Design a protein with these regions (language model features):
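Catalytic Walker B motif of ABC-type/P-loop ATPase nucleotide-binding domains
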Residues: 169-173
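The feature captures the beta-strand-to-loop junction immediately N-terminal to the Walker
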Residues: 45-47
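Helix-to-loop junction immediately C-terminal to a conserved catalytic motif
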Residues: 60
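Conserved ABC ATPase "signature" region
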Residues: 123-140, 188-191
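H-loop/switch region of ABC-family ATPase nucleotide-binding domains
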Residues: 204-205
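ABC ATPase NBD coupling module
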Residues: 76-96, 121
């Protein structure tokens, strides 16, 4: 039996194909193509207004491109809503911390598991317990999120995403508000997750963190991805399944 190919050589988990997004007369995304392979951390950098947030929103399902495709494991998910993408294995965090202050840490994580379709199941209990241990939050499981420091809240939000047991993780400024020790802990954690096969897209201004953990760094400018290492960020087309044609009214 032939050995399995390295994770980085396998088909991408998430892909963008020629995405275009316009707002009035402004082109926020201009024919953007991108592949996120399993087991690798891809960092996206660029000045404010370069198109990073728009690309992130189109990939996550918070926005729709005017043209182009978003593919998850070769399946066209361009018109699928966020909650459906979550059930298919795509999770995200937000630049502004998004936790439920009135819920305990464990129940915040449970939200992620339930969004992935594990509502009220033993599978959800296991996912929450596993993620609490992974993030070192066991001792805070029953604490309400309100009043916790920024670094801990960032971990709680990351835990919500990881409790869904995704194959693709989109992180929007995950190190914002963290001190040096917390950023170090985040770097170790994300590196371990990628080594376990997770495909990660990181939008981050902390260049030290990016330089330490990213397998490749892509730069956006004026709605375009700049070539990296002499090649376009997405150079190899992949076969895709037919579009579901499902929309959520957007």
């Amino acid at each position: 039996m032939s050995p399995a190919p390295p994770l980085s050589a396998r088909a991408p988990r998430l892909s963008a194909r020629a995405l275009v997004r316009r707002f009035g007369g402004v082109t926020a995304l201009d024919q953007v193509s991108l592949d996120l392979p399993p087991g690798r951390i891809t960092a996206l950098t660029g000045h404010n207004g370069a198109g990073k947030s728009t690309l992130f929103r189109c990939l996550s399902g918070a926005d729709r491109p005017d043209s182009g495709q978003v593919l998850l494991d070769g399946r066209d998910i361009t018109h699928l809503p966020e909650y459906t993408r979550a059930r298919l294995g795509l999770a995200r965090t937000f630049q502004q911390i998004a936790v439920f202050p009135g819920l305990s840490v464990a129940d915040n994580l449970r939200v992620g598991a339930e969004q992935a379709g594990r509502r009220g199941s033993l599978e959800a209990d296991f996912a929450v317990a596993r993620t609490l241990r992974l993030l070192g939050l066991d001792h805070l499981a029953d604490r309400p999120a309100s009043g916790l420091p920024t670094g801990t809240l960032r971990l709680v939000e990351l835990g919500r995403a990881l409790s869904a047991e995704p194959g693709v993780l989109l992180l929007d400024e995950p190190a914002a508000g963290l001190d040096r020790a917390e950023s170090e802990r985040l770097a170790v954690l994300l590196t371990a997750l990628a080594a376990d096969g997770l495909a990660v897209l990181l939008v981050e201004h902390d260049r030290e963190l990016v330089d330490r953990i990213a397998d490749r760094v892509l730069t956006m400018s004026a709605g375009r991805l700049l070539p990296a290492d002499g090649e376009l960020p997405s150079a190899t087309p992949i076969a895709t399944a037919p579009s579901d044609g499902t929309a959520d009214g957007a």
